[in-house]
Regions:
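Phosphate-group recognition and catalysis centered on beta-loop-alpha active-site segments
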Residues: 1-155
Length: 155
């Protein structure tokens, strides 16, 4: 019988029931309540920046709208996704993949990184994420599991 090496409880979308989903605040709260691993979703911005967001649009999580794949990374990373969740999180923004990996490492969290490409961007999203991870040296990334509903993104 294989032994599962990962924690049995993983904070989905960085603990999105307790903090704005897929945010650095969510990572901190997940660690604070004792989670040892988190799951987060990664999509690409128009200019190829991998950012943490679940939906293809901003509509559900932000007080603004737009399609993630049609917006630049700098704009996405300045988008407030905290206020809509609760006023106590006002100013919490969409993090870059780099920021999330750094924070996971600091907090000692393992991560299930779900590659969530916009339609038509499957291969590109997988490659960008793969290159970003490969560029990190030893000790620069947390324990990591890659997942996706897109086979192409994982190739």
């Amino acid at each position: 019988m294989l032994r599962w090496p990962w924690p049995k409880v993983i904070a989905h979308r960085c603990g999105g029931a307790l903090a704005p989903e897929n945010t650095l605040a969510g990572l901190a709260i997940a660690a604070r309540i004792g989670c040892r691993a988190v799951e987060f979703d990664v999509m690409l911005s128009r200019d190829g920046e991998p950012v943490l967001i679940h939906d293809e649009t901003l509509d559900r999580c932000a007080n603004s709208s737009g399609t993630v794949a049609a917006l630049d990374g700098a704009l996405l990373m300045a988008t407030d996704v905290g206020e809509r969740f609760h006023h106590a999180f006002a100013g919490e923004t969409i993090p870059s993949l780099d920021a999330a990996l750094r924070r996971c490492r600091e907090l000692g969290l393992a991560a299930n990184l779900e590659i969530k490409p916009a339609q038509g961007h499957e291969v590109e999203t997988g490659r960008v994420v793969g290159r970003r991870l490969a560029s990190l040296g030893p000790g620069q990334r947390p324990a990591l599991l890659l997942s996706s509903f897109s086979e192409e993104a994982l190739e």
